[in-house]
Amino acid sequence: MPPVCGRRCSRTGEVRRYPGSFVRKWKRVETANGPRFRSVVAPHEVALLKHLVGALLGLLNERESSSPLDELEVITGIKAGNAQRPEDPTLRRLLPDFYTPDDKDQLDPAALDAVDSLNAALRSLHEPEIVDAKRSAAQQLLDTLPESDGRLELTEASANAWIAAVNDLRLALGVILEIDRPAPERVPAGHPLSVHFDVYQWLTVLQEYLVLALMAT
């Protein structure tokens, strides 16, 4: 993850990541029912997260609905995934191939066909479970967003769901921004995607602080 390098508020020490937004650290609190992770989000941050997660869920639902109906699924109830690679670049980032050989550029057509067949079989078998996990994490993030006072309190399970969902949001934004590892720390002033990049950095630090809170003892 890129380092926390945003402008700090002199009064609170919070890190500003995009116009009107501050990343506030998470506080770990031990309770009789296990650890809780507390923070505060502003109303416009809640609205932003709802918008981003809604778009993510739309993509995942669209992918699931593209799976062909399988006779065995009707009989067994076991879902089969779409065997084809997603055409949408964002979905390709979220649901990459299961196997990519290091020497793929040097393989002959027959070997490439074998790799494609393997990935198709793995997608059909495992993609439904992956989509369900991503959707569940995204829905948990939505369900735990505050409605009024901005105060967040997450269980350990919810915190892990937030980390997974925020990571998927970063992957999706990374496609728009054409970000490859490692991500740049800034884009030129006036760049048409500068606001998207600021949101990407905000999500990165939000995720980083929550990971640190989970790792704290």
Curated annotation (Swiss-Prot):
Origin superkingdom: Bacteria
InterPro entries to which the protein is assigned, alphabetical: AosR
One family name in Pfam for this protein: DUF2017
Residues passing through the membrane, by range: none
Residue window of motif CXXXC: 5-9
Disulfide bonds, paired cysteine numbers: C5-C9
Keywords: Disulfide bond, Redox-active center, Stress response, Transcription, Transcription regulation
Similarity remark: Belongs to the AosR family.
Protein name per the record: Putative oxidative stress regulator AosR
Gene: aosR
